[in-house]
């Protein structure tokens, strides 16, 4: 996803770079030719993507370190993020990685950007999905991940706020994970907590008794069911 925002009084709808390196902005209405304009980025959107992307770096780096997993697919959507790893992971494995990823958040580590020289780059154990040449941008989360990446990231891990794996599934012999970070994770928790409170109020049980309350209700329904 590109950044959105405004140029002068026009909304930016899309941004593309052509083969010659020229950046083109698609806007919703014409701007007078020859005038100097000010561009403003939609910061809420940008920061949201930075949180998701930075969280993915930490989780993927940990998966690589602890389970030898390679990130073979990453999709950053408007509502959720998916990570495809090339090894099967158990629920216990994923719970461990999630816990360790959030430990990295709590440490509020600096996320470092560098452009190593060719000789130095050859010695770095960095992650990359393809062979790279020329000037390579390296993103490092000290102790957690070193990755070649041209994306946007938060300045410190604490800005991610929270990393939560909401679900996972077997995928092409590996594992597909669904992840929420930062404000997305908070809003997801707030919605689900509200749902839990509504259900537990109806069942007259405490939130921590939801499962047992549901099982009791299900059993009562089964006992009184007329066939």
Where are these regions (language model features)?
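Active/ligand-binding-proximal structured segments within catalytic/core domains
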Residues: 1-7, 30-83
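Solvent-exposed beta-strand/loop surfaces of large extracellular or lumenal domains
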Residues: 7-22
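Short beta-strands and strand-coil junctions in structured, solvent-facing domains, enriched
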Residues: 18, 46-48, 184-187
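A generic structural motif
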Residues: 20-29, 81-87
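Short solvent-exposed strand/turn elements
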Residues: 25-34, 180-182
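Functional cores that coordinate and move charged inorganic groups
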Residues: 45, 65-171
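Solvent-exposed alpha-helical segments within well-ordered globular domains of core cellular machineries
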Residues: 61, 95, 99, 103, ...
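Terminal appendage regions of diverse proteins
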Residues: 160, 166-227
């Amino acid at each position: 996803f590109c950044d959105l925002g405004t140029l002068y009084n026009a909304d930016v709808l899309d941004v593309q770079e052509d083969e010659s390196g020229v950046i083109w902005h698609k806007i919703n209405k014409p701007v007078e030719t020859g005038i100097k304009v000010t561009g403003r980025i939609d910061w809420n959107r940008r920061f949201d993507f930075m949180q998701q992307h930075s969280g993915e770096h930490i989780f993927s780096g940990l998966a690589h370190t602890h389970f030898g997993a390679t990130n073979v697919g990453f999709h950053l959507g408007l509502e959720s993020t998916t990570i495809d790893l090339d090894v099967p992971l158990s629920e216990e494995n994923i719970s461990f990685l999630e816990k360790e990823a959030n430990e990295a958040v709590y440490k509020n580590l600096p996320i470092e950007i560098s452009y190593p020289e060719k000789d130095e780059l050859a010695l770095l154990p960095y992650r990359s999905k393809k062979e790279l040449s020329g000037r390579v941008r390296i993103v490092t989360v000290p102790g957690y991940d070193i990755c070649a990446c041209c994306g946007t990231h938060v300045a410190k891990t604490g800005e991610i706020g929270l990393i939560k794996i909401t679900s996972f599934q077997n995928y092409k012999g590996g594992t597909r994970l669904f992840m929420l970070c930062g404000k997305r994770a908070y809003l997801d928790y707030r919605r689900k907590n509200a749902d839990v409170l509504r259900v537990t109020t109806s069942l007259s049980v405490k939130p921590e008794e939801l499962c047992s309350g549901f099982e009791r209700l299900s059993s009562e329904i089964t006992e009184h069911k007329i066939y």
